[in-house]
Amino acid sequence: MNLKYLFLGIAIATFTVTAKAIDYVPQNTSASISLKVPGNIAKQYPLNMQKLQNDGSAYLLEASESIPLIVSQRVENIDGKVNIKVCITALEDVYFNYNQQVSTGFRHDDCQFYMPGFWYRRNLRSPKEAPSFHTSDSWLVREDRLSAPLTGIYCEKEKSYMTVNRLDAFTDDALTTHREGEVILSGKTSIGFTGFENKNGTATLSFGFPYREAPRTYIRKLTLAPEVEAFQFLKKGETVLLTWVLAENKAEDFSEFIQHAWEYCYDTYSPKPVETPYSIADMKETMSAFFVNSLVEKHPLVFNSGIHLRTDECHKNGQAEVGFIGRVLLNAFNALEYGWENNREDLKNNSTKVFDSYLKNGFTPAGFFKESVNFDRNTEDPVHSIRRQSEGIYAMLHYLAYEKENGRRHPEWEQRMKTMLDMLLQLQNADGSFPRKFNDDFTIVDKSGGSTPSATLPLVMGYKYFKDKRYLESAKRTAAYLENELISKSDYFSSTLDANCEDKEASLYAATATYYLSLITKGEERRHYADLTKKAAYFALSWYYLWDVPFAQGQMLGDIGLKTRGWGNVSVENNHIDVFVFEFASVLQWLSKEYNEPRFSDFAEVISTSMRQLLPHEGHLCGIALTGYYPEVVQHTNWDYGKNGKGYYNDIFAPGWTVASLWELFTPGRAEELLAK
């Protein structure tokens, strides 16, 4: 028997022979393998698919010249999807990179593209310094950049889509000495690549193993480097088995496509809660150390120092931010509430100092919050953001409602908040949107409406607290804008303050905003807002990891056992994971009941348990200097915010917002309780 067929028979004997579903034929697919001899430029060998006799689902992939590998493929039809099982066996010691393309048959110009947590539509909201169509209409990326190892292509003209995803145990990664060019891996990796390419005007799914990134690799914030191609060592006689799944279906629009893709990925990768030793009570008790140790009292404003800290020191500084990223006022309220619940006089007293100082010294001449003050430099940001102003009002309305519930009133604060809500009404545009940034005299700095949903929350809360219907009407107008410009167009962007691109927070805030309106309305109106919440929630969910990316030995996050499922990618520009969740888990729990969808509540539990893993405490500091200062920029792929790379944090972080986010995660149903009173 021919040696090639002997190896082939051994490798695929256990596979089941079934018919194909998608039109998977040699004319619609191509494959190649690149081989590298150390010290030499790799050579690529196109592979021809030769169907085996008497076996309609098995192929031998042969090069036109002799190569020291046997490459075979079996195609199986399982539940209407095509499983592609590739077997690569080494006849000699080799370094290889395998890649394959499958044509969708769609015109590339008619398509929108999707790589979960990283690529939405054409990424045209992103700057040219980040991956987008501004640079190229074809992109290949390593799988660990994505919240699920999948690429989808949606044809708007045909209302059809095709996806490819990989199945594996995903247990290994390996270090390399270089981040670009042809690189030989120092060991085994489980990370392949996926993406889309324009092949003569036709949209094509591309995938392979080990990883490759082209035409650029995104290695640092706003830094594209030359492409990279990794080569895996395969010893003579060893075999690698790789599995990809192709699927195609119909979807009325891009939003419905995202829903189908997320549900498929959720069912495929089936993320389960992460076991940790920390209860919710443990988390709050440990994080409360941040409230105590970060307090700064020597300036006109009293605040928790929670931004721009060094991870290896956590020394306090003089920078105070009302909203994101410091969340000074929300932290003060959380500390106050926790202090009353647990008889912590220190927390109650500290929070009172924060509130009193902001009431006295925390407002601009026009009456807005001094949202970002740097006492170290004696500067104050003259530009306001709708997001930070809204987050400040949100925190204070929680505070006022809590105090009122317990028999304590603060008339000066009430008047300040009513004045600010009235000022928001002046800022609102005719289409219901709010400008992203503006000056103290109400002149507009950035008219973009992507941050609009952040204002919906305090407007609904203001209506509930002050019984002023103008605030509810304003909130409903924001929802009309969200529906018309973001949700219906599947275009969620510009919510973060340190990036202006497609991001998780825009869809998360949109879902939370319409959730608030669902809680305060009735009948058909309530159902309409609930439907919008559900639609936006799928986009937010698509940013959260459904699998555990592997780390190499020596990368701290892997060495301490981090499981990435349940963590959220941030944005196209900021390709790291974090614990930004706030009330979103409560939104998911509510949606689960409203629509009888257990995936929502089940995944909320995955998020809740997974985000407990990096709790810093004595003996388990997780690379952070102080107990309770929860890490922020968690770098899980070949990217960094500026320092340290995969497996580590950036050297600067902002525990002010991470503690606030987790605190709301572990205080479920807060909005429902507030708005039901």
Where are these regions (language model features)?
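Bacterial Sec-dependent N-terminal signal peptides
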Residues: 1-22
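Glycine- and aromatic-rich loop/turn segments at beta-sheet edges
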Residues: 288-320, 360-382, 424-444, 483-501, ...
